[in-house]
Amino acid sequence: MTDLYIDADACPVKAEAERVAVRHGVRMFLVSNGGIRPPAHPLVESIFVPEGPDVADMWIADRARTGDVVVTSDIPLAAKVVAAGALVVKPNGETLTQANIGNALATRDLMADLRSADPFRQGSGRPFSKADRSRFLDALERAMRKAQEAGRSASGGSEAGS
């Protein structure tokens, strides 16, 4: 069965992800160290983890598997869950796969090196837009369909009626 995991701290698309999860009838886990409003829908569960570096990421990485979808901007977390067989969608609609996760990790490391070399470098990106939100919804919808199919295949097709 497909689960949807949201790396919820500072995630701008929680409401959109919830709509997609409810439409597909899948459980959604909002994983954070607090500060988010509890969900109203019974398919959506808030998971509050202790504060600390990467605690929410570790919670997600320990559970995500083939047939699941993870929404995160965290590239190291994405690498872990892609290795476990999960599909990854970033809030801007970009998907991360076995084919592109190595490049994403290398780019992340390069940008971290550039930022550390120039302490006066300000802001690194453009604001989140309606177009990003639209791309996210489209990418998440496609990922959910693909994950549900992968989940059925991984379980030998035993999820009749899904």
Swiss-Prot record:
Database matches in InterPro entries: UPF0178
Coiled coil (UniProt feature): none
Family: Belongs to the UPF0178 family.
HAMAP family, A to Z: UPF0178
PANTHER family: UPF0178 PROTEIN YAII
Name of the protein in question: UPF0178 protein RSKD131_2223
Biological classification of the source: Bacteria, Pseudomonadati, Pseudomonadota, Alphaproteobacteria, Rhodobacterales
